[in-house]
Amino acid sequence: MPARIAHLSLLVPDYDAALDFFRRIGFECREDTELGDGKRWVRIAPPGGDAEILLARAVGDRQAASIGEQGGGRVWLFPETDDFARDYQRLEAAGVTFETLPRDEPYGRVVIWRDPWGNRWDLIENTRSDRG
């Protein structure tokens, strides 16, 4: 079995709008390759991040209905930061919807927010010394 997860697909309605949003919150585009028939292979990640998000333009009613609901209503994307204040301000400037105020938990500083399509994210600055 592979030793790591390389990509996670995120359904979006439009590649360019998604790229614009993710660039505004500090992600970088690692690849944007045309595949024909309007399909692209678009990989994004936070700078220095290992795992990547593959932006997938929804095709058909089933996929379109899943945009923003891939986590089934749960927080399911957990970017970890080394500078909570910087990234919180970046999210705020990008106009995300915050569901909570920033708070301290036993594992770190967190805030729950939604992207433009409704996906729930949890920005975390881990403060535990026993990460593993």
Language-model features: locations:
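Vicinal oxygen chelate
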Residues: 1-7, 25-80, 86-116, 124-132
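Conserved beta-strand-loop-alpha-helix junction that forms the acyl-donor binding cleft
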Residues: 11-15, 37-38
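Amphipathic alpha-helical segments
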Residues: 14-29
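Residues at or immediately preceding the N-termini of alpha-helices
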Residues: 15, 84-85
